[in-house]
């Protein structure tokens, strides 16, 4: 039983790392070739992205603020500032993606919608 839980935990961490890599590549202006979005990974992947976006907003212009994604704090700190209307609009688009994920819209399309919603490093 312990091994099964550990294996699941490792699989979850692997998905989180994969989604985070995809997120940072997208924000840095790349168009990632691999995708994380499958029917099985969609909910967890979207939650990972929302957490990274929330941390990005919090880290924008606020030194010493505690982030949820401590392991990505340095990379988040290097991103351009994300504030105000842009931040609100992005959170709204992520909510819309989560709503679409509960429908019969393909996971790949939901992932692509999220990628297009993410602002890139240039203002």
Specify the residue positions occupied by each region the protein language model found.
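AAA+ P-loop NTPase domains with strong preference for DNA replication initiators
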Residues: 1-85, 89-123
């Amino acid at each position: 039983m312990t091994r099964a839980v550990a294996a699941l935990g490792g699989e979850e961490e692997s998905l989180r790392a994969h989604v985070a890599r995809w997120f940072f590549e997208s924000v840095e202006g790349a168009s990632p070739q691999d995708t994380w979005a499958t029917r099985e990974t969609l909910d967890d992947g979207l939650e990972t992205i929302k957490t990274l976006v929330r941390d990005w907003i919090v880290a924008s212009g606020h030194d010493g603020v505690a982030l949820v994604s401590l392991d990505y704090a340095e990379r988040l700190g290097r991103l351009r500032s994300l504030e105000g209307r842009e931040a609100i609009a992005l959170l709204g688009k992520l909510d819309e993606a989560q709503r679409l994920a509960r429908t019969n819209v393909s996971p790949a399309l939901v992932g692509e919608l999220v990628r297009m919603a993410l602002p890139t490093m240039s203002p």
